[in-house]
């Protein structure tokens, strides 16, 4: 391999001469061998972004080629791991260099010494094709890790297949052409893994959050953005999705966010229990912790490495959720690198290729028919942190052009202590039509109708609130006063949800439906009483309304709900 020399250093960007490396090849910069990537070539000059701190690098230091691009190591043992942005396990880095990561450390993303029990799924003489599972490993109690023929391998006839305990580098299968297959795959992180075909998003991704599942659903294999200003609850929202979504694997990429938040996450995850399996949540999770004080170039690597890992598990036929917190920090890293490279700035100083890079990332999501046969999906939820909560800035606008679900976090709701602070008037989901038939079949036939009724009440409430601010609610006609009351019940009893309450943090579909139906039944009783000449104050003060508010905090709510609805019916019949 060629050895070049450093010519110029500008922050995380290094210019080198004397190399023959290609675009996006991995190179090692300086005497310490800092992990870096070629991002530009001009004549005999190579522009390199360095994934580690460049302090102390000087012109004339060596730059060594590695002969290939940045790759993710994929194999048994990556679940439960906590990595930095370039897939180095943080616990191993801490063992080698203490709590502060030293430069130039190389650690494998997958443990090469640990032995795994390999169970073959094919036999001698079988023909295997790219992407086909040849065996499996019980990686966690509930996750079977399928060992697949690499997608770029041509496949062939099995000559030998072994069974027993092996490390990831030991041969587990030999084909007729002499090629040997191991449990370890390496895949360039910037390159999407192939599938047979993409499938339409017709299955919802259950989150247990009423405002999302009810009004703005995300499909399995879907894309969503959570833009919000400082303190609106983006990180808590993403952590809640990571905890409760009905997916098999969760990949959480902390991209340029606060170190304290990542520390909280790493303390919480091992203690949390997955409600579907009653196992620790970390058993189905992979965390990429790339905090704001780490080198900016590694933010891009963490996003792509996380996505490659997600695609790998999708290829096994699993449903995967990848959350990126926050894509704005990645965009800021792009802006810093672009300015160091003296590129022509676009809007607000971001590079002209900002939209292309974001699209490149989000388009790797989707539900697909995988090479092995069967289906898998990767859903992506990206947080966006617009400065000052301004949704017109370039990162938010370019993200909205690509994603199909927009959960707009509103600082006014945050100030009212309403969480999740998703604004029900600004947000939208383009998957609603695709998912209507699923909800009608699996939740209730009138679910979509109830949802539309509730949204119409909230929209009318927004119009009435402007009048109330001017003249007060008492000046409104009685029917509009009732509409305000029902809207307040929907907002406070149904849309608001506590992420820290053991019961309310997760709400199943049936409970969502029953609670919303109960509120709309109150509305029907109320308007019926109004037509009979009952005063509004009497209607508002029925005791069963307060009992209804408490049901969202009750786990076995159905007996109580029946009592409350019977009580409500009796109270309204007694009103004169």
From Swiss-Prot:
One biological process term in Gene Ontology: proton motive force-driven plasma membrane ATP synthesis
Entry keyword annotation includes Translocase: yes
Subcellular location: Cell membrane
Keyword annotations from UniProtKB, A to Z: ATP synthesis, ATP-binding, Cell membrane, Hydrogen ion transport, Ion transport, Membrane, Nucleotide-binding, Translocase, Transport
UniProt-recorded Gene Ontology molecular function terms: ATP binding; proton-transporting ATP synthase activity, rotational mechanism; proton-transporting ATPase activity, rotational mechanism
Membrane topology: Peripheral membrane protein
Catalytic activity: ATP + H2O + 4 H(+)(in) = ADP + phosphate + 5 H(+)(out)
InterPro entries for the chain: ATP-synt_VA_C, ATP-synth_a_Xtn, ATP_synth_asu-like_sf, ATPase_a/bsu_AS, ATPase_F1/V1/A1_a/bsu_N, ATPase_F1/V1/A1_a/bsu_N_sf, ATPase_F1/V1/A1_a/bsu_nucl-bd, ATPase_F1/V1_b/a_C
Main location per the UniProt record: membrane
Residues where ATP binds: 228-235
Entry EC number(s): 7.1.2.2
Root EC class: translocase
The protein's name: A-type ATP synthase subunit A
Source organism of the structure: Methanothrix thermoacetophila (strain DSM 6194 / JCM 14653 / NBRC 101360 / PT) (Methanosaeta thermophila)
Gene expressing this chain: atpA
């Amino acid at each position: 391999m060629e050895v070049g020399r450093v010519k110029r250093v500008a922050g995380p960007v290094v210019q080198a001469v004397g190399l023959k490396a290609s675009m996006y090849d991995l190179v090692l910069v300086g005497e310490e061998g800092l992990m870096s990537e070629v991002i530009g070539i001009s004549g005999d000059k190579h522009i390199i972004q360095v994934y580690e701190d460049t302090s102390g690098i000087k012109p004339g230091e060596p730059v060594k080629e590695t002969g290939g691009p940045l790759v993710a190591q994929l194999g048994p043992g990556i679940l439960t791991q906590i990595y930095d942005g370039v897939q180095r396990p943080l616990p191993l880095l801490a063992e080698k260099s203490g709590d502060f990561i030293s430069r130039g450390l190389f650690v494998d993303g997958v443990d090469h010494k640990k032995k795994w029990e390999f169970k073959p799924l094919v036999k001698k003489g079988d023909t295997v094709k790219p992407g086909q599972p040849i065996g499996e490993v019980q990686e966690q109690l509930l996750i079977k890790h399928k060992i697949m023929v690499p997608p770029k391998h041509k496949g062939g006839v099995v000559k030998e297949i072994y069974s027993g305990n092996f490390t990831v580098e030991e041969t587990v299968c030999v084909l007729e052409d002499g090629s040997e297959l191991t449990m370890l795959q390496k895949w360039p992180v910037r390159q999407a893994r192939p599938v047979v075909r993409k499938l339409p998003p017709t299955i919802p991704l259950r989150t247990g959050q009423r405002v999302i599942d009810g009004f703005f659903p995300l499909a399995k294999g879907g894309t969503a953005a959570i833009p919000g200003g400082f303190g609106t609850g983006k990180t808590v929202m993403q952590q809640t999705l990571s905890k409760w979504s009905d997916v098999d694997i969760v990949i959480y990429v902390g991209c340029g966010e606060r170190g304290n938040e990542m520390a909280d996450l790493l303390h919480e995850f091992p203690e949390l229990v997955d409600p579907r399996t009653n196992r620790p949540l970390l058993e189905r999770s992979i965390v990429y912790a790339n905090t704001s004080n780490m080198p900016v170039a590694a933010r891009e690597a963490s996003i792509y490495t996380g996505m490659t890992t997600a695609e790998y598990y999708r290829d096994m036929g699993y449903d995967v959720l990848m959350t990126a917190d926050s894509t704005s920090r990645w965009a800021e890293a792009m802006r810093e690198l672009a300015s160091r490279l003296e590129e022509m700035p676009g809007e607000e100083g971001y590079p002209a290729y900002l939209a292309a890079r974001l699209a490149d990332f989000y388009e790797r999501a989707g539900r697909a028919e995988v090479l092995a046969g069967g289906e898998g999906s990767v859903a992506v939820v990206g947080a966006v942190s617009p400065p000052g909560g301004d949704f017109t800035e370039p990162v938010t606008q370019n993200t909205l052009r690509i994603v199909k679900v927009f959960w707009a976090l509103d600082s006014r709701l945050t100030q009212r202590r309403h969480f999740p602070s998703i604004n029900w008037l600004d947000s939208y989901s383009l998957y609603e039509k695709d998912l209507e038939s699923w909800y009608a079949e699996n939740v209730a036939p009138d679910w979509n109708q109830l949802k539309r009724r509730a949204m119409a009440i909230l929209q009318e409430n927004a119009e009435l609130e402007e009048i109330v601010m001017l003249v007060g609610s008492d000046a409104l006609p009685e029917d509009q006063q009732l509409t305000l009351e029902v809207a307040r019940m929907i907002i406070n009893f149904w849309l608001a949800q506590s992420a820290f309450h053991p019961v309310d943090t997760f709400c199943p579909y049936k409970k969502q439906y029953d609670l919303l139906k109960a509120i709309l039944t109150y509305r029907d009783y109320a308007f019926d009483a109004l037509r009979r000449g009952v005063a509004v104050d009497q209607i508002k003060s029925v005791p069963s309304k307060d009992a209804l508010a408490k049901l969202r905090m009750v786990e076995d709510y159905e007996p109580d709900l029946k009592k409350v609805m019977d009580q409500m019916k009796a109270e309204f019949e007694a009103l004169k």
